[in-house]
């Protein structure tokens, strides 16, 4: 990445079988994230990678933070594939950038409203089933992840604050009707 300036978007620690497979492919790597790092695929804070899922990444957080990696939290896909529940609160507490994603391959909707709702719901399940010290996401936090959290990867977008770029799509409803 440093040579080409091209950024990487991929999956990281989505499910236990994927983690085991990467360990077979790169046995010298300490964990799945290290497999990316040894091949210089995480970039740096100026050219960070985006890694989707990051469900089993608690031992990878230092490496994610060091490289400025953005986490794309895809709650619907994680539910549909029974992958697990991402430790989003822990990412936020560690200062790791998080945005919401839809992962259309494993999800059924591109709706950020749906992703936002599911992010709150699965964070409650994480709190109840995995770590009762990890507070569930609030609506405001999930809204941030769906807007400015993910938008910050692209610069000053994702919010209506002064100094930010307008990055919305305006669709006229009459043009979307079937049969027209």
Regions found by a protein language model. Name each.
Residues 38-44, 89-177:
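His/Asp/Glu-enriched, well-ordered alpha-helical/loop segment
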Residues 1-106:
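Active-site core of metal-dependent hydrolases
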């Amino acid at each position: 990445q440093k040579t080409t300036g091209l950024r990487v978007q991929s999956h990281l620690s989505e499910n236990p079988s994927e983690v085991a497979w990467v360990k077979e492919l790169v046995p010298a790597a300490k964990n799945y994230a290290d497999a990316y790092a040894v091949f210089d695929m995480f970039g740096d804070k100026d050219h960070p990678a985006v890694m989707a899922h990051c469900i089993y990444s608690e031992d990878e957080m230092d490496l994610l933070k060091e490289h400025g990696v953005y986490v794309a939290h895809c709650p619907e896909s994680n539910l549909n594939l029974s992958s697990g529940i991402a430790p989003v609160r822990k990412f936020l507490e560690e200062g790791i950038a998080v945005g919401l994603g839809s992962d259309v391959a494993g999800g059924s909707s591109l709706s950020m409203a749906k992703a936002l709702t599911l992010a709150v719901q699965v964070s409650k399940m994480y709190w109840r089933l995995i770590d009762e010290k990890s507070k569930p996401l609030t609506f405001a936090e999930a809204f941030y992840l769906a807007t400015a959290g993910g938008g910050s990867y692209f610069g000053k977008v994702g919010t209506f604050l002064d100094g930010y770029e307008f990055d919305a799509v305006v669709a006229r409803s009459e043009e979307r009707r079937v049969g027209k």
